[in-house]
């Protein structure tokens, strides 16, 4: 059987609120965002820094719900600083037949790291942030065109 490592969870364009070099390691994520993304404490994630291009792997620590906390801990604080925009990505190994139909949890946040929208399309660019879709230079489909997915109605 073939297994593929697929995108499972994505928190898009979160703002790093704190960085603590002297912590033992990890990323602290607001519990509400963790639940929306389907991330668990201790789960491995990649953190992609939009501000400076750094990429790293670490594990998740649950932060206070609805706090907007995104905190970089330990050695990663050398690479990612408060104020940086990041994408937090979780993956899952899936059998090929499951991977073909799996839809990830894509979480969009505002500048305060509060959940503003959820989706399943990893190429989606949320309206109002000045981005284009990841798979085309075409404009985003309207919200009414996207209404078929109940997770988009946030």
Curated annotation (Swiss-Prot):
Cytoplasm found in the keyword field: yes
Q: State what protein this is by name.
A: Aspartate 1-decarboxylase 1
Query: Which spans does this entry mark as compositional bias, Polar residues?
Result: 135-145
The species this protein was found in? Frankia casuarinae (strain DSM 45818 / CECT 9043 / HFP020203 / CcI3)
Residues with the Pyruvic acid (Ser) modification: 26
Starting at the broadest rank, the lineage of the source organism is:
Bacteria, Bacillati, Actinomycetota, Actinomycetes, Frankiales
Give binding positions for substrate.
58, 74-76
Q: Which InterPro entries match?
A: Asp_de-COase-like_dom_sf, Asp_decarbox
Cofactor(s) of this protein: pyruvate
Biological process, per Gene Ontology: alanine biosynthetic process; pantothenate biosynthetic process
Tell me how the cofactor is bound.
Answer: Binds 1 pyruvoyl group covalently per subunit.
Single GO molecular function: aspartate 1-decarboxylase activity
What's its catalytic activity? L-aspartate + H(+) = beta-alanine + CO2
């Amino acid at each position: 059987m073939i297994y593929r490592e697929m995108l499972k969870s994505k928190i898009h364009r979160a703002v790093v609120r704190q960085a603590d070099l002297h912590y033992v390691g990890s990323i602290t994520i607001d519990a509400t965002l963790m639940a929306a993304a389907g991330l668990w404490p201790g789960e491995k994630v990649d953190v992609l820094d939009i501000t400076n291009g750094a990429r790293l792997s670490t594990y998740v620590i649950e932060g206070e719900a609805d706090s907007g906390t995104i905190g970089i801990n330990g050695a990663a604080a050398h690479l990612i600083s408060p104020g940086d925009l990041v994408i937090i990505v979780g993956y899952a190994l899936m059998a090929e037949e499951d991977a073909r139909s799996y839809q990830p949890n894509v979480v969009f946040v505002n500048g305060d790291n509060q959940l503003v929208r959820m989706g399943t399309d990893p190429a989606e660019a949320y309206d109002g942030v000045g981005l284009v879709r990841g798979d085309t230079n075409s404009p985003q489909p309207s919200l009414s065109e996207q209404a078929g997915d109940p997770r988009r109605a946030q």
